[in-house]
């Protein structure tokens, strides 16, 4: 109701919500991209080939520019089979013309600006016209 304390902050928080994240780190990655002035990424993008065959699903990204952002948590390295599946899935996505940017907790923590620059450069190379406004110094508590 009118005059309720915290209502503007609540509206901002609701606007940032996205049910597609499968981990807190995926959420933090998405929020970092938004804080860095990138377009809001789509989450859990299903990628199919030209015949409609399922290729894979990416954590988040930009379908328009075929730029995928993958957060690699420990499950991606949980044994040789998981590792092989991850490598194969990335190769299949790249064969469909996607640029895949892989991030991890340590990369986001210690090389945040480099990570954001990779996303910016990939999107610029694919035609994103607002690349100059990307803030590589954006931060969130990661």
Residue ranges and their predicted role:
Residues 1-142:
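Surface segments flanking catalytic/ligand-binding clefts of nucleic-acid enzymes
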């Amino acid at each position: 109701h009118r005059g309720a304390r915290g209502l503007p902050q609540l509206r901002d928080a609701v606007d940032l919500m996205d049910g597609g994240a499968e981990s807190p780190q995926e959420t933090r990655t998405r929020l970092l991209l938004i804080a860095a002035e990138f377009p809001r990424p789509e989450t859990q993008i299903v990628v199919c080939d030209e015949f409609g065959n399922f290729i894979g699903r990416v954590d988040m990204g930009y379908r328009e520019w075929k730029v995928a952002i993958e957060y690699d948590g420990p499950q991606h390295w949980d044994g040789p089979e998981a590792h092989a599946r991850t490598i194969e899935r990335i190769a299949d996505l790249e064969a469909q013309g996607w640029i895949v940017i892989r991030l991890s907790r340590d990369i986001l923590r210690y090389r945040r600006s480099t990570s954001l620059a990779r996303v910016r450069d990939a999107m610029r190379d694919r035609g994103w016209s607002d690349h100059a406004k990307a803030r590589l110094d954006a931060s969130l508590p990661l």
